From Swiss-Prot:
One GO CC annotation: cytosol
Cofactor(s) listed in the protein's UniProt record: Zn(2+)
Protein name: D-tagatose-1,6-bisphosphate aldolase subunit GatY
Entry superkingdom: Bacteria
Known function: Catalytic subunit of the tagatose-1,6-bisphosphate aldolase GatYZ, which catalyzes the reversible aldol condensation of dihydroxyacetone phosphate (DHAP or glycerone-phosphate) with glyceraldehyde 3-phosphate (G3P) to produce tagatose 1,6-bisphosphate (TBP). Requires GatZ subunit for full activity and stability. Is involved in the catabolism of galactitol.
GO terms, molecular function: tagatose-bisphosphate aldolase activity; zinc ion binding
Quaternary structure and interacting proteins, as annotated: Forms a complex with GatZ.
Species per Swiss-Prot/TrEMBL record: Escherichia coli (strain SMS-3-5 / SECEC)
NCBIfam families named in the record: cbbA, PRK09195.1, PRK12737.1, tag_bisphos_ald
Length: 284
């Protein structure tokens, strides 16, 4: 069985001192590039999708594609619900075979966040599904959810321990200065806060908003306990820019099988770099 939970992936990463990249996919070509590149580098990867992606492609279609590609390449893959907020939506997708969930209730007050997350954990663990949750809020936009930078909150290390123990989550997404989207200038990550969180919480930690971070910053977060690195915008930008360039240079192009190749090549460069930055090549 090549479609797996993220729990063992992330526990292995925690023990091995590397991170597993989670790539948000948006179409068939994105998935092909992620899986083909990961298989060629023998690297564990997570196929992530926001609610918008699952609505666009269809849950059953995505599950079938991931399963087929995992078998084709004899490569373990996890399909992960990224930034899902509704219990009924999560439950339906779990019953369809999804084995990794992020319940995002980080916009709620602390006690309500715990209550919402624990409800999802109690349900998901009955199906051997791993659960990630977020404490603190990232700025930027994910799907149609916009968080102003002024409203973004960093993760409190002491609260993080209480949150982890009260909910029973399998991994914790932390807010240390990253944001969804690309950065106009290099962000100032709070490494001391991350180190403090690591001292209080013995779970695999997750970094959202990693698109555009430097190799140095990514590798420093891994040293301080990050076991999962989320990348979305960087893939979308590479795809769209390469496609625009190709169609500008070849205005006569009409066959998607031709003009999408340039976009796939551009995404392949992103995926291989992220895998290298995470230190997970050869770990699958």
């Amino acid at each position: 069985m090549y479609v797996v939970s993220t729990k063992q992936m992330l526990n292995n990463a925690q023990r091995g001192g590397y991170a597993v990249p989670a790539f948000n996919i948006h179409n068939l070509e994105t998935m092909q590039v992620v899986v083909e590149t990961a298989a060629s580098m023998h690297a564990p990867v997570i196929i992530a999708g926001t609610p918008g992606t699952f609505t666009h492609a269809g849950t059953e279609n995505l599950m079938a594609l991931v399963s087929a590609m995992a078998k084709q390449y004899h490569h373990p893959l996890a399909i992960h619900l990224d930034h899902h907020t509704k219990f009924d939506d999560i439950a339906q997708k779990v019953r369809s075979g999804v084995r990794s969930v992020m319940i995002d209730a980080s916009h709620l007050p602390f006690a309500q966040n715990i209550s919402r997350v624990k409800e999802v954990v109690d349900f998901c663990h009955r199906f051997d599904v791993s659960v990630e949750a977020e404490l603190g809020q990232l700025g930027g936009q994910e799907d149609d959810v916009q968080v102003n930078e002024a409203d973004a909150l960093y993760t409190n290390p002491v609260q993080a321990r209480e949150f982890a123990e009260a909910t029973g989550i399998d991994s914790l997404a932390v807010a240390i200065g990253t944001a969804h989207g690309m950065y106009a200038s290099a962000p100032a990550l709070d490494f001391s806060r991350l180190e403090n969180i690591r001292q209080w919480v013995n779970l695999p930690l997750v970094l959202h908003g990693a698109s555009g971070l430097s190799t140095k910053d990514i590798q420093q977060t891994i040293k301080l306990g990050i076991c999962k690195i989320n990348v979305a915008t960087e893939l979308k930008n590479a795809f769209s820019q390469a496609l625009k360039n190709y169609l500008t240079e070849h205005p006569e192009a009409t066959d998607p099988r031709d003009y999408l190749q340039s976009a796939k090549f551009a995404m392949r460069d992103v995926v291989s770099k992220v895998i290298a930055d995470c230190g997970c090549e050869g770990r699958a």
